[in-house]
A protein has these predicted regions:
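Transition segment at domain starts
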Residues: 1-20
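Conserved short histidine dyad/triad with adjacent acidic residue
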Residues: 11, 20-40, 72-75
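Short histidine-centered beta-strand/loop micro-motifs
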Residues: 27-29, 35-39, 56, 62-64, ...
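Short hydrophobic/aromatic-rich beta-strand segments that constitute the beta-sheet cores
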Residues: 37, 54, 90-92
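Short, conserved beta-strand element in jelly-roll/cupin
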Residues: 40-54
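Short acidic-glycine-tyrosine-enriched beta hairpin
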Residues: 59-76
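Ligand-binding loop in jelly-roll beta-barrel domains
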Residues: 74-95
Length: 95
């Protein structure tokens, strides 16, 4: 798969999707703010820089993820994410 650029939420979330070791992956930047994403496949989000707070659909509490930490989202689900105190960079692996 050739790298593919994606833009969401009026340009506030930018990503580049590619295949790594046979697995679909994307890297990107989330501008400060709050956003909701739906999932088809299960995903693992790793915070590369900055901080993301996340809340998976069906849960009550926001969990803080600083750089170097990850969280997983089930397939056919969704999650809220917010970049706090500036933009955040991430790597998303589709499981």
């Amino acid at each position: 798969m050739a790298p593919q650029h994606n833009s969401y939420f009026e340009g506030n979330v930018q990503s580049v999707a590619f295949t790594r070791n046979g697995r679909k992956t994307s890297v990107g930047v989330i501008a400060e703010g709050q956003y909701h994403f739906g999932t088809e496949a299960a995903e693992r989000m790793t915070v590369v820089s900055g901080r993301l707070d996340a809340k998976v659909d069906g849960t009550e509490d926001w969990i803080v993820y600083p750089a170097g930490t990850s969280f997983e989202i089930p397939a056919k689900s969704g999650f809220d994410v917010r970049a706090v105190n500036g933009d955040a960079a991430y790597c998303c692996e589709y499981l």
